[in-house]
């Protein structure tokens, strides 16, 4: 190759190198979502408040204030027990990890409990007494309920011998293996564990998305609160679905979708399992 030929090719090569460098920089640039539409926390970003071996965090609202919903987390160590107590308002507890030892009644009997594993959702009936403990692997719990749920004591007759460990008139536990799933038009599957997102009231729903499954851009009438139970979800904001302008969130991440904000989400090379909660209609 002659010198004159090289001189002719060199400018074009420089341009191509600049283009490729620009593409590489763009590919590596971090994606920033509109946090007024959708906020999130990675597992390492959750600011647990530790006290006497127990971690807690209010994600939304205030359980002491009546009239609104609240969302919170609780992490308890092995052999941590509550005294029998009640709550005056509706609430739902999802076991995220570990073993939740649940029971009902005014007298604590640690041999009369039901061991509930990850994926179990418990409905606690207002005004009914219950207590709980923690298995050897600890437990992490996700709560959604109506405000005013300060713990209190009440008078209730002792439970008669026999019968189930958990009185279903006081506490209803739905285990993952017993849930019935339906297939949505977009290829995902879901189960409405308690409530229904299309109707008024609190709801708790599980959603599973296969690999390479995406929603359209959409919005919700009310705030929605999501926990990644397994896999990785990719989330974006805005009215145009752009799979390259998303943030990947692994198991243990939390998402808050604000009412009427337009967003989208999907999966890439693996399935995802989501806990979806809120106040309907969604």
For the regions a language model picked out, list residue spans one by one:
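Bacterial N-terminal signal peptides that target proteins for export
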Residues: 2-14
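Bacterial N-terminal signal peptides
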Residues: 12-22
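A short, N-terminal "cap"/entry segment at the start of jelly-roll beta-barrel domains
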Residues: 27-70, 153-203
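Conserved short histidine dyad/triad with adjacent acidic residue
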Residues: 70-87, 126, 203-220
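Glycine- and acidic-residue-biased ligand/ion/polar-headgroup-sensing regions
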Residues: 77-78, 87-107, 210-213, 220-240
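Short beta-strand His + acidic residue motifs that chelate non-heme Fe in jelly-roll/DSBH
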Residues: 82-84, 101-103, 124, 129-135, ...
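Short acidic-glycine-tyrosine-enriched beta hairpin
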Residues: 106-127, 239-260
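Ligand-binding loop in jelly-roll beta-barrel domains
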Residues: 126-150, 259-282
């Amino acid at each position: 190759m002659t010198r004159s030929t090289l001189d002719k090719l060199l400018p074009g090569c420089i341009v191509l190198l600049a283009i490729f460098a620009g593409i590489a920089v763009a590919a590596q640039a971090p994606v920033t979502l509109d946090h007024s539409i959708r906020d999130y926390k990675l597992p390492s970003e959750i600011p647990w408040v530790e006290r006497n071996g127990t971690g807690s965090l209010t994600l939304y609202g205030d359980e002491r204030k009546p009239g609104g919903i609240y969302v919170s987390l609780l992490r308890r160590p092995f052999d941590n027990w509550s005294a029998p107590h009640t709550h005056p308002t509706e609430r739902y507890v999802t076991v995220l990890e570990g073993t939740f030892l649940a029971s009902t009644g005014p007298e604590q009997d640690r041999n009369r409990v039901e061991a509930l594993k990850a994926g179990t959702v418990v409905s606690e009936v207002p005004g009914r007494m219950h207590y709980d403990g923690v298995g050897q692997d600890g437990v992490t719990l996700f709560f959604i309920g109506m405000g005013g749920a300060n713990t209190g004591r009440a008078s209730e007759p002792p439970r008669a011998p026999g019968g189930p460990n958990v009185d279903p008139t006081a506490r209803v536990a739905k285990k993952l293996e017993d849930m019935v799933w339906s297939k949505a038009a977009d290829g995902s599957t879901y189960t409405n564990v308690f409530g229904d997102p299309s109707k008024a009231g609190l709801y708790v729903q599980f959603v599973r998305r296969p690999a390479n499954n995406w929603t359209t851009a959409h919005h919700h009438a009310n705030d929605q609160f999501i926990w990644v139970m397994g896999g990785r979800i990719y989330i974006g904001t805005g009215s145009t679905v752009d799979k390259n302008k998303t943030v990947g969130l692994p198991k243990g991440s939390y998402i808050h979708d604000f009412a009427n904000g337009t967003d989208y989400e999907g999966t890439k090379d693996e399935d995802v399992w989501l806990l979806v909660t809120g106040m309907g209609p969604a």
